[in-house]
From Swiss-Prot:
Organism: Helicobacter pylori (strain J99 / ATCC 700824) (Campylobacter pylori J99)
Underlying gene: ftsY
HAMAP family hit by this protein: FtsY
Protein name: Signal recognition particle receptor FtsY
Keywords tagged on the record: Cell inner membrane, Cell membrane, Cytoplasm, GTP-binding, Hydrolase, Membrane, Nucleotide-binding, Receptor
Subunit structure as annotated in this protein's UniProt entry: Part of the signal recognition particle protein translocation system, which is composed of SRP and FtsY. SRP is a ribonucleoprotein composed of Ffh and a 4.5S RNA molecule.
Functional summary from the UniProt entry: Involved in targeting and insertion of nascent membrane proteins into the cytoplasmic membrane. Acts as a receptor for the complex formed by the signal recognition particle (SRP) and the ribosome-nascent chain (RNC). Interaction with SRP-RNC leads to the transfer of the RNC complex to the Sec translocase for insertion into the membrane, the hydrolysis of GTP by both Ffh and FtsY, and the dissociation of the SRP-FtsY complex into the individual components.
InterPro entries: P-loop_NTPase, SR_rcpt_FtsY, SRP54_GTPase_dom, SRP54_N_sf
């Protein structure tokens, strides 16, 4: 399967390779291609139902743009603006999705904007997660608030935000646990952390971002729904997209959850985070569909 995310990276690096494109594709074949990109079948049907038996690149592009800009999605898939200081980001997701690395990338973005950042090692039951965040903190020269292994993560969140207030920090990024094998405990823990954040911020708003492993495709939606039901998420960051052809899951997130896709993780370095551009995404998806095999 053509990896159109690699194409996005190549474009950014100025290494784009020109490929021959087909002028049209039969609808049945197009459905198979889009399924291969891990787009849900009911969404595919919705996109193509008003199109003929032969579909051109322009027709598919228009259908995709109508989808992402339609009334039911457009307003709901914009990130709300929060001006509170410190601006707190509660970062959630299953273990292995790339939460800790993504937090480092977000902190790097904050530093690039000449803001002061602070990290909270809230996955207190995993010493490796705390250590990894501390290493990133050292590399970025950003303080990491941590606690003894097994400490209450809500207390850690409280202490992190209190420290940020005292130090006039601009942005706070708090890591969390992601042990989905025990859903009830995890949901209770995350709810408690969110409540604590609200309390210390005196009910001022804060962000709740989900880190979703892009290699899992649409199967990651089940995880996403659990986190969204628990926290009322504000946005999604898709990771590990430099090595997958399952980018259609981005459309499935918009379709199922009506949440904004904020960034795409394209590697392990702190700069490998690309702001999601829906027009570029659609353009590259359409190019990938119509490339001659």
């Amino acid at each position: 399967m053509f990896n159109f995310f690699k194409k996005i990276v190549n474009k950014i690096k100025g290494e784009e390779v020109k490929e021959k494109k087909r002028e049209s594709v039969p609808k049945e074949e197009l459905e198979e291609i889009l399924i291969g990109f891990d787009i849900q079948y009911d969404l595919i049907e919705s996109l193509l139902k008003h199109l003929g038996d032969l579909i051109t690149p322009k027709q598919l592009e228009v259908a995709l743009l109508r989808f992402v800009r339609g009334e039911s999605y457009y307003d709901k898939t914009r990130l709300k603006t929060i001006t509170t200081k410190p601006l707190v980001h509660l970062i959630v997701g299953v273990n292995g999705a790339g939460k800790t690395t993504t937090i480092a990338k977000l902190a790097k973005l904050s530093l690039k904007q000449h803001k002061k950042a602070l990290l909270g090692a809230g996955d207190t039951f995993r010493a490796a997660a705390v250590k990894q965040l501390q290493l990133w903190g050292e590399k970025l020269n950003v303080q990491v608030i941590s606690a003894k292994e097994g400490s209450d993560p809500s207390s850690l969140a409280y202490n992190t935000i209190e420290s940020a207030i005292a130090k006039n920090i601009d942005e706070v990024f708090i890591d969390t646990a992601g042990r989905l094998h025990n859903q009830t405990n995890l949901k209770n823990e995350l709810s408690k952390i969110a409540h604590t954040c609200s309390k210390v911020l005196k009910d001022a708003p804060f962000y709740k971002f989900l880190i979703l492993d892009g290699t899992q495709g649409s199967s990651g939606l089940t995880q996403a729904k659990i986190f969204h039901e628990t926290l009322a998420l504000d946005g999604v960051i898709m990771t590990k997209l430099d090595g997958t052809s399952k980018g259609g899951a981005i459309l499935s997130v918009l379709y199922e959850l009506k949440l904004p896709i904020l960034y795409l993780g394209m590697g392990e370095k702190e700069d490998d985070l690309i702001a999601f551009d829906e027009e570029r995404f659609i353009e590259d998806l359409v190019d990938a569909v119509f490339v001659e095999q």
